[in-house]
């Protein structure tokens, strides 16, 4: 989550550095979470410094595969070219890993049992040809309270978005900042 600290924007701490073509595993996720925790304890995670969600504890958390919130920004392809948006989205980059495979790893490890929300962003998430398959892969029967938040410019109609809205699976946040 983004926030300001001493007039500087912070947040957006990257959990896993992706290598082209290599899908992260649950073990990668656990190791990355532990590394970020250790960096925060040593004040070496600049992106997190000043975050109001941090708190002191004497108990080191367990780094299991459990996911409470998941933000998926696996590509930066967009169908607009807004002047306020970062240039990395102009033209965009495709995903470096198989997102469906990663979601399946999480499913197999019962990671979504306590998950509240999965957020889809990064460019225009509905442009991914596997968007419907990926969103549908998260087993909602494991946690009926889980929902998906899709950040979209809502310029392009997508059958899956309508279906997911009708089924109550997703909520959309439309970004129409008149930046085009």
Regions inferred by a protein language model and the residue ranges of each:
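Short, non-ligating residues that shape and space the ligands of small metal-coordination modules
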Residues: 57-60, 91-92
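Leucine-rich repeat
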Residues: 98-107, 132-134, 160
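A short acidic (Asp/Glu
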Residues: 62, 82, 129-133, 159-162
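Short pre-active-site segment immediately N-terminal to redox-active cysteine/selenocysteine motifs
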Residues: 47, 55, 77-81, 88-89
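Core AdoMet radical
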Residues: 67-77, 86-100, 112-129, 141-158, ...
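A generic secondary-structure signal
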Residues: 105-109, 137-141, 163
